Amino acid sequence: MNKSKRSFRRRLPPIRSGETINYRNISLLRRFISEQGKILSRRMNRLTSKQQRLITVAIKRARISAPSPFLNNESRSSTNY
């Protein structure tokens, strides 16, 4: 009944300390949006609840003000329709 020792590797936080959550920061927001344009869950993002709320509000603002579209056009251009 020996328990195998697995090496524990600490993951890097998805949002670095210098990054601000802002609706104009599209490169940050795209990391938290799926290929279908959906906001990824907090468990998949490994965010705190406060960070997830701020990300959600920023994505919704970006969709309305149009820096970020509702659907990700990059995934659509890679497949031929």
Swiss-Prot record:
Keyword annotations from UniProtKB, A to Z: Chloroplast, Plastid, Ribonucleoprotein, Ribosomal protein, RNA-binding, rRNA-binding
PANTHER family recorded:
30S RIBOSOMAL PROTEIN S18, SMALL RIBOSOMAL SUBUNIT PROTEIN BS18M
Q: Does the keyword Translocase apply?
A: no
Its Gene Ontology biological processes? translation
Organism of origin is Huperzia lucidula (Shining clubmoss)
The UniProt subunit note reads as follows: Part of the 30S ribosomal subunit.
What NCBIfam families does the entry give? S18
Q: Which family does it belong to?
A: Belongs to the bacterial ribosomal protein bS18 family.
Q: Tell me which PROSITE patterns the record gives.
A: RIBOSOMAL_S18 (PS00057)
Question: Is Nuclease given among the entry's keywords?
Answer: no
Q: Kindly list the GO molecular function terms attached to this UniProt entry.
A: small ribosomal subunit rRNA binding; structural constituent of ribosome
Q: Which GO terms describe its cellular component?
A: chloroplast; mitochondrial small ribosomal subunit
Indicate the segments annotated as coiled coil, or none if absent: none
| Protein name per Swiss-Prot or TrEMBL | Small ribosomal subunit protein bS18c
Its predominant location is plastid
Judging by the UniProt lineage, the source's domain of life is Eukaryota
